[in-house]
Structure formats: structure tokens, C-alpha cells
């Protein structure tokens, strides 16, 4: 596996791959990799000739009081994991290479509508940071396909709209959420949980499943969501939101909505956890 941090070297290497008509897949990450990230690499490996992963802790998507400084940097272990899953190239750019004029002066990309509400309401500017760095990486790598986990469902929808609106010729592939045996969605931030919190954390997914089952049984969404929020509070969570949205665009559900998605964000101690679950609403 090749490791590059220079933009010019990256472009030269991938130019040769495109010249040979090779299909290029991109897996953007912030590092501190777990089995969820590696599932993206595995999916890319099945589909492409050249698999490119990026490791970049993007300061533009962190808020002022968030965990940018403490976010784990585990480059050596990450590189070993990527190589063992068949990644061909890992790109590890410096911040001043991607943002040469600084964060405030850099052109930023904002995706309206789908980035508003949910995590967008609780993390102002987060999705602008995500859309900006992903646009940069799309421009530098010029992949045929890019792979994102569905655990970050709102982010996945932001990227899909970004690609559609800006006419990037890139296929966006969503990979199902990877979970621990007890149901907790895999996340780099799970490492922030204390041992006691880690034991309680699977209740987030269990609550989603309970709300899902109530909705499938015909319970009115406001009632099911209210009961879900109460259940989370009883189990020690501080919810940011628990909402039911249209799966296709995160718009509000309507009487004729069939395919919906439950989305939750909640704090357990100092750790913010997110999850989601698709639900087919009864007619």
C-alpha cells in the first residue's frame, strides 16, 4: 500500500490509473479506524480496481467546544488495518495543504435543506465543514465511486445532494451500519465511553427498535417518539433529538409516507452518540 501526503504526487499517481481505465474508489475517513470503516474499504475493494482511503481530521467540521484536539490520531495502526483489507493508497494531507489560506478565508460549500435540523441544528457549521472537505477530496481524487456509512445518515444524504447539485460524476455508495454484538453502532467516539457507560449505551439502539416496532404496529408517530424520548431519559441519556423523517430526503413525513427513517442523537455522559433505523410505515 502506498502512503502519500503530497497533493501533486496523489494526482500524478491517480492520473496514471485513470489513463489505464481503472475504476477508482474513495473511502474518506478521519482515522481511528474500526470495523465500520473497514467495511467501507471491503465494499470498495469488491467494486474497484484502485481503492483510495483518506485520513484527515478535518478542523472545519468541529465546533468550538467539540473534540478536535482530543480526537484520536492513530495513523500507524490505521495504515496497517487499511493494508490488511486491500487498500491500495492512503492519502494523509496536511491541514495547510488543503486549507492554504486558513479556515476562515477558505471557500466553503454549504448544502441547504438536508443539512438543516437534526445534527445540523445541534452542530452549527458541521455539515458545511463536511461538504467542503468532501468536495476537496472529490476534486483531488476524482473517484468513480465514494463510500460512506449509513450510520451517519444525515451526512450520507448531504453528500448525495452535494453530488447531485454540483454534478460530480461520482457514484455514492451507502454501506449498512456495522454494530457490536450488543447492537451499539460502531463509532470512533465509542472509545470516549466509560466502562459503565459502554454497558448502558446499547439501550440507544434498543429504544430505536422499540419505537420502530410501535410504528409498525400502527401507533401514531408523536406518541411513539414521545415514549422513546422518555425511555432514553430513564436510561440516563440526554437526547438532542429523536425524529421520524422521510428516508428519501429527510423531509417531514406525510400521511402517504411509506419509507421513513428514525434518527436519534443523545449524550451519554460526555459522549454524543447517533444512530438510525429504517422503518416501513403501515398504510
Swiss-Prot record:
Residues the entry annotates as binding beta-alanine: 61
EC number per UniProt: 6.3.2.1
Main subcellular location of this protein, as a coarse class: cytoplasm
CDD domains the record matches: PanC
Coiled coil, from the record: none
Catalysed reactions, as listed in the record: (R)-pantoate + beta-alanine + ATP = (R)-pantothenate + AMP + diphosphate + H(+)
An example Gene Ontology molecular-function term: ATP binding
Its biological purpose: Catalyzes the condensation of pantoate with beta-alanine in an ATP-dependent reaction via a pantoyl-adenylate intermediate.
Family: Belongs to the pantothenate synthetase family.
Other notes: The reaction proceeds by a bi uni uni bi ping pong mechanism.
Protein name as annotated: Pantothenate synthetase
